[in-house]
Amino acid sequence: MGRYTTDQVQVYVLVIVLCTFFSTLQARSLRDHPLIHKNIDSRSLLQKLRIHISNHKQVRDISGDRLSPAGPDPQHNGRSPPRK
């Protein structure tokens, strides 16, 4: 078997070090980090923007008059598509 050169060993060590660095970086909690801003929930953000949720109505369609499609429309789908 061939032996590894020092350059190859250095590259492997560098890859292993970078992989462990990035895996620990993903698992780190940044809650107490000074650059992370405090958590703002959506209601307080909307209040700061002077948008009042109570003034907006929620429209929900709860009527039972919905119809399901009856299938292909013969006016539009009466003919079969042309064959090539």
From Swiss-Prot:
GO biological-process terms attached to the record: cell differentiation
Superkingdom of source: Eukaryota
Glycosylation sites: P72
In-chain residues carrying the UniProt-annotated modification Hydroxyproline: P69, P72
Signal peptide start-end: 1-29
GO cellular component, one term: extracellular region
Segments for region (Disordered): 57-84
InterPro entries per UniProt: CLAVATA3-CLE (IPR039617)
UniProt keyword list: Developmental protein, Differentiation, Glycoprotein, Hydroxylation, Secreted, Signal
Anything else known: Overexpression of CL13 in roots almost abolishes nodule formation when inoculated with Sinorhizobium species. Roots of plants silencing CLE12 and CLE13 exhibit increased number of nodules after infection with Sinorhizobium meliloti.
Family statement: Belongs to the CLV3/ESR signal peptide family.
Identification of the protein by name: CLAVATA3/ESR (CLE)-related protein 13
